[in-house]
Amino acid sequence: MSQEFAHLSVLLTETVAGLNIKEDGIYIDGTFGRGGHSREVLKHLGENGRLIAIDRDPQAIEAAKQFADDARFSIVHGGFGQLATYVEELGLKGKIDGVLLDFGVSSPQLDDAERGFSFLRDGPLDMRMDNSQGETAADWLARAEVEDMAWVFKTYGEEKNSRHIARCIAADREKTPFLRTKELADLIARISKSKERNKHPATRVFQAIRIYINSELEQIDQALEGALTVLAPQGRLSVISFHSLEDRMVKRFIRRHSQGESVPHGLPITEAEINKTRLLKGVGKAIKPSDEEIERNTRARSSVLRVAQRLEH
């Protein structure tokens, strides 16, 4: 891999430590990326251990060839939202000792202008995680109604000026369609009312479009629920999120399954029966990167790690 597109895995030591790896365990890296977390997991596994990686990016599948000679490693080309399906097909449901999920966009994806994720590098307005299928960001911007764009920008980007930006995009595309990342980023910078320091005005809109195009929040929801179904008793879940939408989903998921089902007052249900509906327990507090890690890798700044453990029943 070129130095230009090198990738530093975020919270690497903390995330793998959260898995509490057993030498002969079976683990899932649901977001392989360029293999940083997988490499660290393999270091902790014995010869009878097993690691199954998942990624929908064809470039990630290519990068996985670095582990081709390691019999403990295999990779599935697909979205992490379908991890439960892949595990069931392998006959391993309820036998997984740990699931690792990193919801960040990898540095090679961001830095490769041709992928269309970056507002700092000009390239085709694509943004697909799997660029072999699906609608591009340019295609969507060409057809989306103002109301739909405004909803996406506000819901997935928490953009306060969502309607204003959507109207300006709709007006400008009548003259020239948006085909390049720089065209969109320049428009947003020109019309933006944002006063956020150290943040490009297009940050939230680009995030929102990327999340929408790739159905990221739906994938996250499916992955979390899927992890719960495949984990063995005492199996661990280590999850890294990068913005508040993702982190809220993870936090609420762990809390919901740690508290168990709510029961209407007065029903003749025992505490033991309620406890059976508690499927997870949180492990420690949320972990954020150290100042030293942020200095090495500024993209780690917004990351948050949460760890949970599958209960016995």
From Swiss-Prot:
Belongs to the methyltransferase superfamily. RsmH family. The keyword Transmembrane helix does not apply. The gene is rsmH. It is found in: Cytoplasm. Keywords: Cytoplasm, Methyltransferase, rRNA processing, S-adenosyl-L-methionine, Transferase. It comes from the Bacteria. Pfam families: Methyltransf_5 (PF01795). GO terms for cellular component: cytoplasm. It catalyses: cytidine(1402) in 16S rRNA + S-adenosyl-L-methionine = N(4)-methylcytidine(1402) in 16S rRNA + S-adenosyl-L-homocysteine + H(+). Its EC number is 2.1.1.199. InterPro entries: RsmH, SAM-dep_MeTrfase_MraW_recog, SAM-dependent_MTases_sf. This is Ribosomal RNA small subunit methyltransferase H. S-adenosyl-L-methionine binds at G35, G36, H37, D55, F80, D102, Q109. GO terms for molecular function: rRNA (cytosine-N4-)-methyltransferase activity. Specifically methylates the N4 position of cytidine in position 1402 (C1402) of 16S rRNA. GO terms for biological process: rRNA base methylation. It comes from Shewanella woodyi (strain ATCC 51908 / MS32). It is an enzyme of class 2 (transferase).
